[in-house]
Amino acid sequence: YIMSHIGGAFIFDFSQIFSDAGILAQRCVQAFDDKHFVVGTDDVYIHNGQTKQSVIDNVLKDELFNSIHSSYYDRTFVAPNYKDNEMWVCFASGVESNTGQADKAFVWNYRTNKWSKRDLPDVSHISWGIVDDSGTYTSSYDADSGSWDSDSTPWDFRGYNPTQSALLLAEPTGNKLHKIDSYQNNGTSYLA
């Protein structure tokens, strides 16, 4: 549906845009480049409010929808990774997930129109924003024991850039997870 300002007593008008498409779950849409990326009930598409276009071929589409756990399909969500021009379709897989949390992601790069896949460490949410991880860097000049000529360790520095956003994973148990750029889950690589 589209909402248009019309003024008067009703203020807004709602009109159906597409009669042949819907959304799989509440968090299955994200905006980018004046478009919306949508995981529908049987397709993955983008639209600009006027026209829609599928962005996944039939083979990969079948693999994606057959991989989503049927009991947890409503926990599927899309996470935007704007830094790398990506949209992540995150879901609980039918084979490996027994927690109901997202353990797989199909990743679409909207600049190259290429898809990739990755494993996730059972996350309930991925968010985009500025991540202050400066608390993990506690070395000070006074505490550094290395000699000036041989010491290459950092001290008293900001371990993040407050002007650059990144992805942050969250798990349902409440443990803080590191930035996605670090490929770490509580200090353990999840790529290994």
Q: What kind of region is each of these model predictions?
A:
Residues Y1-F18:
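Surface-exposed extracellular loop regions of Gram-negative outer-membrane beta-barrel proteins
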Residues D20-K35, T41-A192:
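Beta-sheet repeat architectures centered on beta-propellers
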